[in-house]
């Protein structure tokens, strides 16, 4: 094992470590403050644009989340909107992540966290009076109301053990009844398995998905009110998910074969409804007697409608690159939520009451004055790598190349407020669709996993090199797994990027599984304790591949001191090693944000500092200093 001179920085309970880290961060922030103060107003303007999302409907009316300078759960009845809860009531830098409603419209629940933590509180309240009827602490999700104040929920255990003794990370389903909890599903599931739960649209059945990381799923289902009768309905050794109950059969998506996704019925056997179409099947809902499915074509979404026997009815395409960010059904209708690079949202309500109709119920006008064009770069092995180019109306000489490339996450169009900040400051922005995502199906994802992870880095290098060759100053930007990407790129090709911005990153690939919940990522990255996996991990691990005497691009590394998903030690150690070799590197440590985000004000200030570092670094480069 190689000696790790900065291992002590993993102990963020040590006051000396915290003091050093905060001191380094203060130096970074003070250095950037004159320029950052000029940018923060611009950033806050875009982060305060209201965005409506997560629409659903029950007997009480239309529910949705709203994000502007706060987060809120809202109820709309006959055009009049009522705020049920706002994050301003919940504490400093509170974020409402999700909400849940019962079928009758009497109760709702919401889960919120403070300062970007993954651990927070679930609150159950009455819709009419807003009186709180229950609270649960933890990492809570997937609430399904049963009536009579009873409900299921899933709880993710980050440390210690699950109630059945399995070592964390692990997840279980609980029944909450009168303030008492009973574990009803998941007993004995090994660590690093996740459980998701939802009810069929008619509330008759529970639909359960057990996932081993992002590699394979097992599906369970049964009567909603009788958890002892939930049984395995499908296991195939690949990714899959249940959609709904339709015509007495379970409708599911299987990512077998070429792994683009096909729709099947599960019953006494498996019968195919809609075969693979050569494009990624992202999700589907049942609305009345129709199936509405979202597909991805070159990283943009379109809708395909089928009847319940799988016969095609129609396709719905959009005028510009778009993402279907949310599909939900309430039986006779449903919602399709769209995202764009240039405008925040568009919401369409689908109705099956008289045939099938689509009606726009909410939208925000265009706010980014740029055009979106598409292109391809050729990776080292001949693979064509798609990208979106958000291009200013006037020519630019600076481009930010953003990537992720992992965990089956597709970088489809989305309104990210940092993009117009860069556009207004004279940059173009490129979003690269690298292997490791699912833009081209699960095979595309698998081509960027484990020992094939280097494909992701080479894909990014191909896209960035194309713009570098065209004369652009190239800025590399990535967050989380995308931070790993940028860290790997600057250690593999130190001369490629003119500036690097690495956010909330995973950078030590030999220790990630021992820091916080990192072992949950073993299915994606591999196991550092396995000699075969360790052999390829050490070859690209950014922290282990910083070399003395090499000039790396100016780099800002930003993270949250209390990020409880990706340990801040990844950032601290990488920073210390880069700085120790005399590189221009800046550490920004946020104390009010974590992996789960924070208030728009906190994020706007963080973005302003990151952009200020980039501006400062490019200015020095242009002056030749």
Where are these regions (language model features)?
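Cap/lid segment of the alpha/beta-hydrolase catalytic domain
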Residues: 88-97, 116, 362-475, 479-480, ...
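Non-catalytic accessory segments flanking enzyme active sites
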Residues: 17-100, 111, 193-224, 230-243, ...
């Amino acid at each position: 094992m190689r000696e790790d001179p900065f291992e002590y920085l993993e102990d963020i309970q040590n006051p000396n470590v915290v003091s050093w880290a905060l001191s380094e961060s203060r130096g970074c922030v003070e250095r950037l403050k004159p320029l950052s103060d000029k940018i923060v107003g611009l950033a806050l303007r875009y982060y305060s644009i209201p965005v409506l999302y997560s629409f659903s409907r029950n007997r009480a009316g239309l529910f949705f989340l709203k994000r502007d300078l706060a987060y809120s759960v809202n109820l709309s009845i006959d055009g009049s909107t009522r705020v049920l809860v706002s994050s301003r009531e919940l504490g400093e830098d509170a974020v409402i992540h999700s909400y849940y409603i019962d079928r009758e419209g009497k109760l709702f629940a919401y889960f919120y966290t403070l300062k970007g933590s993954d651990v927070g509180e679930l609150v159950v309240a009455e819709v009419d009076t807003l009186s709180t009827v229950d609270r649960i602490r933890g990492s809570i999700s997937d609430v399904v109301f049963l009536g009579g104040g009873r409900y299921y929920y899933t709880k993710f255990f980050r440390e210690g053990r699950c109630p059945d003794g399995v070592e964390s990370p692990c997840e279980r389903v609980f029944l909450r009844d009168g303030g008492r909890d009973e574990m009803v599903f998941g007993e004995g599931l090994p660590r690093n398995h996740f459980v998701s739960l939802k009810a069929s649209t008619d509330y008759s059945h529970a639909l359960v998905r057990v996932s081993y990381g992002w590699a394979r799923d097992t599906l369970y289902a049964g009567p909603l009110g009788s958890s002892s009768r939930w049984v395995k309905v499908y296991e195939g050794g690949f990714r899959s998910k249940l959609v709904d109950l339709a015509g007495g059969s379970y409708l599911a998506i299987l990512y077998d074969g070429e792994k683009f996704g096909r729709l099947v019925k599960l019953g006494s056997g498996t019968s195919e409804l809609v075969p693979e179409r050569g494009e990624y099947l992202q999700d589907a809902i049942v609305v009345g007697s129709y199936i509405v499915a979202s597909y991805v074509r070159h990283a943009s979404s379109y809708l395909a409608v089928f009847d319940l026997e799988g016969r095609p009815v129609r396709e719905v395409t959009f005028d510009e690159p778009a993402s279907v960010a949310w599909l939900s059904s309430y039986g006779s209708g449903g919602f399709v939520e769209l995202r764009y690079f240039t405008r925040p949202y568009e919401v369409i309500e689908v109705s099956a009451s008289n045939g099938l109709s689509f009606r726009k119920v909410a939208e925000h006008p265009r706010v980014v004055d740029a055009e979106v064009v598409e292109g391809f770069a050729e990776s080292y092995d001949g693979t064509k790598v798609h990208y979106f180019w958000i291009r200013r109306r006037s020519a630019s000489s600076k481009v930010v190349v953003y990537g992720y490339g992992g965990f089956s996450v597709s970088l489809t169009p989305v309104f990210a407020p940092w993009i117009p900040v860069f556009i207004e400051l004279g940059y173009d922005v490129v979003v690269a669709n690298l292997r490791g995502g699912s833009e081209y199906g699960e095979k595309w994802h698998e081509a960027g996993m484990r020992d094939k992870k280097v494909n992701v880095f080479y894909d990014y290098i191909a896209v960035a090199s194309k713009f570098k060759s065209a004369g652009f100053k190239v800025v590399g930007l990535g967050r989380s797994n995308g931070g790993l990407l940028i860290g790997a790129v600057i250690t593999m090709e130190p001369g490629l990027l003119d500036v690097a911005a690495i956010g909330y990153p995973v950078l030590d690939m030999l220790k990630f599984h021992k820091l916080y919940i990192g072992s949950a990522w073993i299915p994606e990255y591999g196991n550092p304790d396995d000699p075969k996996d360790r052999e390829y991990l050490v070859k690209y691990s950014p922290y282990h591949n910083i070399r003395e005497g090499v000039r790396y691009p100016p780099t800002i590394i930003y993270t949250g001191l209390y990020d409880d998903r990706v340990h801040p030690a990844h950032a601290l150690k990488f920073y210390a090693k880069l700085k120790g070799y005399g590189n221009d590197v800046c550490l920004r440590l946020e104390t009010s944000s974590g992996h789960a985000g924070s208030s728009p004000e906190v994020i706007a200030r963080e973005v302003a500092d990151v952009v200020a570092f980039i501006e400062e670094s490019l200015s020095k480069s242009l002056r030749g200093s």
